[in-house]
Amino acid sequence: MIETITHGAEWFIGLFQKGGEVFTGMVTGILPLLISLLVIMNALINFIGQHRIERFAQRCAGNPVSRYLLLPCIGTFVFCNPMTLSLGRFMPEKYKPSYYAAASYSCHSMNGLFPHINPGELFVYLGIASGLTTLNLPLGPLAVSYLLVGLVTNFFRGWVTDLTTAIFEKKMGIQLEQKVHLAGATS
């Protein structure tokens, strides 16, 4: 009986110890990275000028290829996951859901060639790569295929989300903004 209670108590405190390890890992790992990326992104926005970024986003928003292919790729390569998603704030309301759909997937599809983008989910690519390595097959074609299929998929995710957003706009009787309007922005 004492052994069962002791084992239960050790398990219970072990739960909190493991939680502490995870928290410490986040405090020393992902949180400083995210804070640094936020600082750099905001510094770049201030350096370049918010109005210029808004105009660039507005131009990208006018074209589905740039909206769901170009901007997510550049944002993902430069700002990594999850900061690329925050670039959506420069999109008009009408395209924010679609941008998110395309950009969130680009964080996965670019991982094979650029592992810095999403190191937390690199295990998906590495799992497939380990099978090829076991078979003594090259990894280059896998990484390139992963990227190219991902780019096409990113575009279609954004485009299909555009269509579903239009359906919901019509059903709900609303019209989402097609221009960028940020608080405190000088247009």
UniProtKB/Swiss-Prot annotation:
It comes from the Bacteria. Pfam families: EII-GUT. It is found in: Cell inner membrane. GO terms for biological process: phosphoenolpyruvate-dependent sugar phosphotransferase system; sorbitol transmembrane transport. Induction: Regulated by an unusual system which consists of the activator GutM and the repressor GutR in addition to the cAMP-CRP complex. Residues 1-187 form the PTS EIIC type-5 domain. Residues 1-28, 89-131 are periplasmic. The chain crosses the membrane at residues 29-49, 68-88, 132-152. Keywords: Cell inner membrane, Cell membrane, Membrane, Phosphotransferase system, Sugar transport, Transmembrane, Transmembrane helix, Transport. GO terms for cellular component: plasma membrane; transmembrane transporter complex. Residues 50-67, 153-187 are cytoplasmic. It is a multi-pass membrane protein. The EIIC domain forms the PTS system translocation channel and contains the specific substrate-binding site. This is PTS system glucitol/sorbitol-specific EIIC component. It comes from Escherichia coli (strain K12).
